[in-house]
């Protein structure tokens, strides 16, 4: 194997990414080297491409980016015991310290010292990516490559959706991006009574209808209260999944929650915004922030969902070769796509 590889790199502090030749990562004693088969583009990668304020404060240059992937192990460190060469794998993109209070208590997703693959350390938009053995997840034979490549965002959806009991509950999802749609699918799969998803993007609303979400609402044209009456809801929503990061959507969700309702919040707002805290207090709402995936319960759950028949294939709207990465990023930046998966 050559000691150089192709990778998408943030080589300079401006808009874009560039295909470069960079060294193959060195494998430490507890590390696994993975030959990447498929990569998917995340909203985080779009922020890095756009070189927005968050990216400028966060990303060291140069940096190999990307963190949604699947591949095959080609080398293991001498201390690795649970994985082997030739194994199909994906990986948890949050590298935790293992030493802080939360890590030692089994709450790694709450680690204060988390490093992000493709953010703080070299990522998976490359022919090879290196991860600690602890972060590597085996992919069963009955899970397709392209589905394993989107397990990172699917995990965000699963973590958000499973934050609260969904059985027999009425669920509102604000934001019909890929993660929002996947969250709605999980809610349906778990036995929610009515699942309503809202957005203002017609392309994403059409995708939500295509995958089988029962109640799809264009918030720019329809009043959510009217929709609730039409579908027979006499009280508010029991569970809210906030996936949009949009102030109007979040305010509408708070307004439409039942007393004692529970809201899991994954969407990141571009700037701070006001909400009516009196409604939160007097409705006795429970708000929970979500970041990433629970390690590794979320991974077990999402593998089980896929093996149990949950079809995510329609969430992938663009399948391209890695040399077409520019087209993939344009699709993601337009907001008129589902997931974009790139083949190495």
From Swiss-Prot:
Protein name, as recorded: L-threonine 3-dehydrogenase
Primary subcellular site in the record, as a coarse category: cytoplasm
PANTHER family found in the cross-reference section: L-THREONINE 3-DEHYDROGENASE
Enzyme Commission number(s) of this protein: 1.1.1.103
Active-site annotation: 44, 47
Alphabetized PROSITE patterns for the sequence: ADH_ZINC
Gene: tdh
Site annotation Important for catalytic activity for the proton relay mechanism but does not participate directly in the coordination of zinc atom: residues: 152
Record function comment: Catalyzes the NAD(+)-dependent oxidation of L-threonine to 2-amino-3-ketobutyrate.
UniProt binding sites for NAD(+): 179, 199, 204, 266-268, 290-291
Pathway this chain belongs to: Amino-acid degradation; L-threonine degradation via oxydo-reductase pathway; glycine from L-threonine: step 1/2
GO MF terms, alphabetically ordered: L-threonine 3-dehydrogenase activity; zinc ion binding
Sites where the protein binds Zn(2+) 2: 97, 100, 103, 111
Keyword hit for Plastid: no
Similarity comment: family membership: Belongs to the zinc-containing alcohol dehydrogenase family.
């Amino acid at each position: 194997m050559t000691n150089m590889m192709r990778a998408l790199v943030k080589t300079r502090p401006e808009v874009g990414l560039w295909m470069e030749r960079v060294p193959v990562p060195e494998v430490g004693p507890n590390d696994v080297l993975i030959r990447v088969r498929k990569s998917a583009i995340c909203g985080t990668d779009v922020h890095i491409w756009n070189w927005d304020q968050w990216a400028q404060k966060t990303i060291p240059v140069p940096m190999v980016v990307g963190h949604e992937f699947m591949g095959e192990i080609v080398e293991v460190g001498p201390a690795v015991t649970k994985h082997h060469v030739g194994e199909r794998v994906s990986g948890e993109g949050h590298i935790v310290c293992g030493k802080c209070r939360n890590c030692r208590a089994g709450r790694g997703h709450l680690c204060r010292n988390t490093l992000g693959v493709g953010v703080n350390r070299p990522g998976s938009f490359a022919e090879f990516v290196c991860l600690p053995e602890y972060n590597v997840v085996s992919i069963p034979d009955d899970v397709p490559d392209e589905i394993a490549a989107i397990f990172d965002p699917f995990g965000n959806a699963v973590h958000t959706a499973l934050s609260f009991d969904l059985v027999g509950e009425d669920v509102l999802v604000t934001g019909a991006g890929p993660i929002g749609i996947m969250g709605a699918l999980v809610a349906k799969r778990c036995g929610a009574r009515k699942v309503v998803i809202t957005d203002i993007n017609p392309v994403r609303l059409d995708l939500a209808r295509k995958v089988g979400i029962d109640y799809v609402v264009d918030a720019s044209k329809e009043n959510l209260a009217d929709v609730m009456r039409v579908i027979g809801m006499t009280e508010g929503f029991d569970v809210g999944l906030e996936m949009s990061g949009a102030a109007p959507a979040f305010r509408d969700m708070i307004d439409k929650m039942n007393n004692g309702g529970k809201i899991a919040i994954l969407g990141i707002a571009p700037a701070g915004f006001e909400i009516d805290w009196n409604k939160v207090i007097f409705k006795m709402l429970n708000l929970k922030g979500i970041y990433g995936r629970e390690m590794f319960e979320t991974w077990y759950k999402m593998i089980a969902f896929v093996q149990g028949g949950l079809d995510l294939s329609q969430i992938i709207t663009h399948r391209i070769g890695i040399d077409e990465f520019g087209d993939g990023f344009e699709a993601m930046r337009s907001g008129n796509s589902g997931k974009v998966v790139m083949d190495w």
